[in-house]
Structure formats: C-alpha cells, structure tokens
C-alpha cells in the first residue's frame, strides 16, 4: 500500500456551504482550501449549473466567503466575506457601470477602517450575476455582519450586526491595543470569541440599491451563546422578520432562546414561544407559518425537534419519532412539507414531515456508505442540493429532483426508518480528485457488538489492500466528540493517513451519542466515564475476537469529548499501548468557570460547591494512580470549551506517576486545529507517538 504523504493535507478541499437558486438551475457552494506557501486558509465561492452542462465556476478566490444566499429572483448572489482592499472599492455603489478600478484614496474611511482594526471585518457582498463583474460590498458595519436574509421582493436585506455604544467602543479599542480585560458578564468567555464584552447585536434593514441602513431597536440579541448563534434573521412572506433571542432576567445563566417577530420598520415586536426551550433556525413557509427547532435547555441529550407555529400554536413534527434533528440540518419548505435531516443510527437521513402526518417518508443518501452533510431545496420545490461525503471520494455537491424524492415509499413511524436507494443523484463536483490519486482511500465496514445489553454500532476503516483476517494489524480507536454527536461513514484525511500506513481505524458510536434515540443518549447523562468506557472496550474486544487486530497494538485518540473519554479509558483500563487525549477535560470540578460551559456542567452535575461528590465521580484525575499508558496530550492555547489548564493537569499528573507523557499546546488556537501546518504537525506527532510504543516496531 502507498502511504498518504502528510503534506498532501494542502491538497485537501473541504465543502462548507451549499445554496440552490430559487428555480433550481444553479448551486452556489463554498470550499475551503489551504495555501502552503503562506500557511493560510482560503474560502472560495463557486457556482455550478444543476444540469451538469458546465464545470463549477469560481467566483472568489482569496480571503473568506460563507453563507451564500440567492436573491428571490435568482439574479444576485449575496454572501459574507472578509476581503482586503483594493477589492472593496465602494460601499453600496449604485452605478454598476462605473470603472471598478476607481481610486478610492480620496474617499472617507469606512466604519471598519475608522475603528482602527487592521483586519478586514466580515460584511455582506453581492454578485450581480446578470451584469457580471466582481462582487461589491453592501454593508460597512464596524464590527462586521454576523448573519443576513433577503426580503421576499429582493429590494432589502435584514442583517444581524453588533452595535457598540461609545463607551463600549472605547473599551473594545483598549482591548485591541492590549488593555486590561474587564467584564461583568457571567458568560465571560466563549470559544472562538475569547473574552466576551457587553456589545449588543441588533437587526438592521439595508436597502440593496443605495446601502442605506436602519436599526430595529427592539430586535436585539441576548443569551450565553449569542455571539456564536447570532440572531438568525428570517424575512417572511407576510413582511415580518423572525429572529431568536434570550430576554430572560439573566440571559447568560440559561440556554433558553425564544423566537420573535417584528415589522421591518421596527414596530410590533411579538414573542411566539413560551420561554421554556432553546429555539433556533426560524424558517418561513409560503403560507406564513414558521418552522424552527426546539431542544431541552436543561438536558442536552434529549432530541432536537422540528416544530411549526401556525399563528396560534406550536406543533412538533418529529416528537414521536425518537430521533434528533441532525446538527448540520437546515429546515426547507416545499409547499406545506418540511424537508430536513435526521440522525438515525450511524447515518444522517433526509426526511419530509408535515403537520398532519409527521415524518412520512425518508430518502436514504444512495445507500448507507456515505454521510449527508447538508441540504437546500429550491424555492420552486423542484430540486434539492445535497452535500455528501464519501470515505473514498471526498466531499461533493449532488442534486436530485424533488419529484424523485417524493416517490419514496411511506414509512411505518413505529418501526426503523427504511432504506431507499433510487439511482437519481447527479454529482456536480469532484473536489478531491488530486488528493485521491496519492493513495488508496479506505474501505468502510459497519460492525456491531454487545455492551451491557445494548447493541453498539461502529464504523471501521481499513486500506483496501489490507487482509483484515490476518489478525496482526494495529488498531486506532478514534472517539467522537460531543458527546452529543455520532459517527457515520465520512471522508477524513486522518483516516486515510492512518489506513494507508496499515492501521485499522474504529469509530464507536457509544452510548451518549444522539443518533440512536432518547434512551440511548441519556445513558451518559451525568454519568461520564461509565457507559462510553464499557462500549469502547467491548468494541475493541469485538475486533480482537474477529481476528482483525493485534491486542498488543491498540492505540487511541479523541478530540473534545473524545479526549475526555480517552482520559477515562487510560485511567480505568490498560487497553491502549499509547493514547492521545486531545483538547479534553479531565477534572470538571477545577474546570468549572474557566471556560464557556458553566451551563452545560450545571445541567449535568449541578454546582460544584453544592454537588462536589458528583464532580468527583466524573473526574479522570482521581484515578490517575492507575495510569500506565503513555500519553500524548494536546491543547489549544485559547480553547475556552476545554481549557488548556485541563491538559496541563493531566500531563503533570502523568509525569508525577512516572508515566511517559508529552504535552503540545498550540498557541492562539481555540477548540479546533485550524491552520494546515498545525493539522500536519498533529498527525505527525500522533503517528510518531504510536510508533514509539508499538511492540511490533520495537521487535523489528
């Protein structure tokens, strides 16, 4: 077999956003690529016809691009971007015939420039696809734009943007210049944001023709994670604008969010929901009803539901199905039917639901050998665009006729969801052809095993040239994060790097994951370090029992809750020859209040000064005297989901026990490994760590 070079990571193309035109004739999508010479990441916006008559056309190449959205008539394409001068010549220009090379040195500085920040801020940009030419910048908000939506007639946009007072602006400027951090907020940190401030996000209405902008004073945000979720504005057919916000007495002390609507002139604010749930993704139907998601703010293991508000009451479309809306799902209306994505066992399924029937059928994404990552349905209801990830092909854009979807058979909602495999998908892209030519991509198998009376599923990856039955192969157990997540067959550079070097990779869907129903997920609620440990150990024993892997050559890694699980596994068992807990939490008691997860911890374990025993029971550090496994521990220097101090504690505890350990901290990195050089470094270090403690390598 041919090893995948780690430097080939620079050839990886990731698919992040898809948006289908109103008539279904084109798909806009965003890819993320890496620049080796500059060690940077670029996001590019593309358009491709759905009939496959032309190859994808790249509209942007440098800077960033995200969240493309077509105007209602399909003539313009709006998106969010942070772009440097001199591309941004004008703000809200009205004469599209002017020379785009016009010198802007005599113009007044923009709000973003006046703010004194050298980095470009994220703004709304527009392509006029009928006239052609480069995109032009529509907004010029000082702190950028977080989200937007089109007015149904296409003449205006509603945008969500921060709007600091003079005092708040002065503080933000002092912070940018290295001044002291000052906060009175309970949610004092947020991963990916850093230390939070008091600046409020509002909705603004922007005229597309001249760029004029008006703030809706009553449409403002609030809540612990507001800086991440945004206001999620949606402009409806009745003229009203829907958005989400938390208006509780102490919005940082709850995960509850409500859905509001308001007139575009800022009058007649209404709250549609009861203040008891976490609501999100408001999406209008043509008849004026409003769909959105609803989840339990106190128990995050409960399924997220799709619900509809008809002007008087709210009805759940998925409550009886015992499955959760997938985390990557959007809500899409066709007439009075809602199309969305559900998590079901080890895969994501496209389903249709109505108020009268609930979920009445399911379209399976051409077999269960790939992951369905995204969905968008054209406004005319003719065509659906899908983002699919195949372990051997990569991430790509597909389309399917909605009429073909609706030919799928009805399902018995008391039984398992069926599998339909119509040959109707049309592939529009081949984003990772160059990468695939460098080695064989892994084969995928689904495996099952028993654990405490439960049937557990896992996804197993191996090189197609590997003879699994020979039984002497090294195994890597890769544990998903969340834990409110799940694994499904997916394209992964890390999987390919490992399998091309002879490793078998197992990704177990342990109890606590969200794709097997309410009872399965709640097995882990408040019980960290119990059920998932049993499920992982049983999965390893299953592969050993099948004769696929060498019991002395079992290794592990996991990121976020996967790292947390690694901490439990190495302090409770000795199944690993070496392990790599990444960006994890190993003592929730000392972690409480140092990151952004105080509401999460309180919902599962209570308050540490009131429930110290519960925190003690879920601390991996308490069992560190049993640790013998060599550990490669990683952390992000600015990770406020799983703070780096947690990795330091585990590292020092391991060294005190005389266990081989290495700590890697990525400066300025949050709960992620973003830069390509760091992603390559991470994989190189993990591979070297495994090799150093592989008995077969030692014998050789």
Locations of regions flagged by a protein language model:
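Multi-bladed beta-propeller domains
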Residues: 1-13, 48-66, 84, 105, ...
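Beta-strand-rich domains and repeat architectures in extracellular enzymes and scaffolds
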Residues: 7-44
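Residue-level recognition of a conserved intra-blade site in WD40 beta-propeller repeats
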Residues: 20, 70, 150, 235, ...
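Hydrophobic beta-strand positions that form the internal "hydrophobic ladder"
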Residues: 24-27, 74-78, 157-158, 241-243, ...
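Short glycine/acidic-enriched loop and turn motifs that connect beta-strands
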Residues: 33-37, 83-88, 163-167, 196, ...
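Predominantly five- to eight-bladed beta-propeller fold
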Residues: 90-122, 162-209, 213, 257, ...
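Cap/lid segment of the alpha/beta-hydrolase catalytic domain
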Residues: 421-424, 429-552, 559, 591-600
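Active-site-proximal cap/loop segments of hydrolase catalytic domains
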Residues: 511-700
């Amino acid at each position: 077999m041919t090893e995948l070079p780690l430097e080939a990571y620079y050839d990886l193309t990731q698919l992040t956003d898809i948006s289908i035109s109103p008539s279904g004739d084109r798909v806009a999508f965003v890819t993320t690529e890496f620049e080796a010479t500059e060690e940077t990441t670029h996001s590019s916006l593309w358009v491709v016809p759905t009939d496959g008559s032309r190859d994808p056309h790249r509209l942007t190449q440098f800077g960033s691009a995200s969240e493309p959205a077509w105007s209602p008539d399909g003539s313009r394409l709006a998106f969010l971007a942070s772009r440097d001068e001199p591309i941004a010549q004008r703000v809200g220009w009205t004469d599209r015939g002017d020379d785009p090379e016009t010198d802007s040195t005599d113009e007044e500085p923009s709000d973003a420039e006046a703010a004194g920040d050298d980095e470009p801020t994220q703004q709304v940009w527009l392509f006029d696809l009928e006239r052609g030419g480069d995109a032009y910048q529509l907004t010029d908000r000082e702190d950028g734009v977080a989200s937007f939506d089109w007015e149904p007639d296409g003449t205006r946009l509603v945008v969500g943007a921060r709007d600091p007072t003079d005092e708040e602006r002065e503080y933000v400027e002092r912070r940018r210049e290295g001044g002291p951090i000052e906060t009175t907020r309970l949610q004092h940190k947020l991963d990916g944001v850093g230390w939070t401030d008091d600046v409020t996000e509002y909705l603004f209405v922007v005229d597309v023709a001249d760029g004029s902008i008006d703030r809706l004073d009553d449409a403002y945000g609030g809540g612990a994670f507001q800086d991440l979720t945004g206001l999620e504005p949606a402009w409806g057919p009745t003229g009203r604008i829907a958005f989400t916000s938390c208006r509780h007495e102490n919005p940082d002390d709850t995960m509850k969010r409500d859905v509001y609507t308001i007139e575009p002139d800022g009058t007649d604010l209404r709250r549609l929901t009861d203040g008891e749930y976490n609501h999100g993704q408001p999406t209008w139907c043509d008849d004026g009803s409003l769909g959105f998601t609803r989840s339990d703010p106190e128990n995050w293991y409960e399924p997220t539901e799709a619900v509809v508000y008809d002007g008087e009451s709210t009805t759940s479309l998925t409550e009886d199905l015992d499955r959760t809306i997938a985390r990557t799902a959007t809500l899409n209306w066709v007439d009075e039917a809602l199309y969305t994505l559900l998590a079901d066992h080890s895969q994501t399924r496209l389903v249709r639901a109505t108020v009268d029937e609930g979920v009445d059928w399911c379209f399976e994404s051409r077999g269960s050998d790939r992951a369905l990552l995204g969905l968008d349905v054209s406004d005319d209801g003719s065509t659906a665009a899908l983002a699919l990830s195949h372990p051997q092909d990569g991430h790509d854009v597909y389309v399917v006729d909605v009429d073909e979807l609706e030919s799928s058979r009805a399902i018995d909602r008391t039984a398992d969801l069926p599998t339909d495999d119509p040959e109707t998908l049309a592939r529009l892209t081949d984003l990772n052809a160059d990468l695939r030519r460098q080695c064989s991509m892994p084969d995928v198998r689904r495996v099952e095993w028993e654990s405490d009376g439960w049937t557990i599923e896992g996804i197993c990856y191996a090189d197609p040239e590997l003879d699994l039955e020979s039984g002497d192969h090294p195994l890597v157990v890769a544990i998903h994060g969340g834990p409110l997540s799940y694994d499904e067959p997916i394209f992964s550079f890390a999987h390919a790097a490992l399998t091309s070097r002879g490793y078998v990779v197992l990704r177990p869907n342990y109890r606590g994951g969200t794709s097997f129903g309410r009872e399965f997920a709640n097995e882990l609620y408040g019980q960290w370090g119990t059920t998932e440990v049993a499920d992982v150990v049983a999965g390893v024993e299953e592969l050993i029992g099948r004769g696929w892997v060498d019991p002395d050559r079992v290794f592990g890694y996991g990121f976020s809750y996967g790292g947390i699980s690694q901490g439990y596994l190495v302090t409770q068992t000795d199944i690993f020859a070496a392990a790599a807990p990444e960006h994890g939490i190993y003592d929730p008691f000392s972690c409480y209040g140092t990151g952004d997860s105080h509401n999460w911890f309180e919902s599962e374990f209570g308050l540490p000064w009131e429930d110290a025993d519960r925190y003690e029971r879920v601390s991996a550090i308490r069992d560190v005297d049993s640790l013998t496994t060599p550990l490669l521990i990683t952390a992000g220097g600015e990770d406020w989901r799983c703070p780096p101090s947690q990795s330091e504690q585990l590292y020092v505890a391991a060294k005190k026990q005389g266990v081989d350990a290495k700590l890697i901290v990525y400066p300025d990195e949050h709960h992620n490994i973003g830069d390509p050089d760091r992603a390559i470094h991470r994989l190189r270090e993990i591979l070297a760590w495994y090799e150093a403690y592989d008995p077969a390598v030692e014998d050789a």
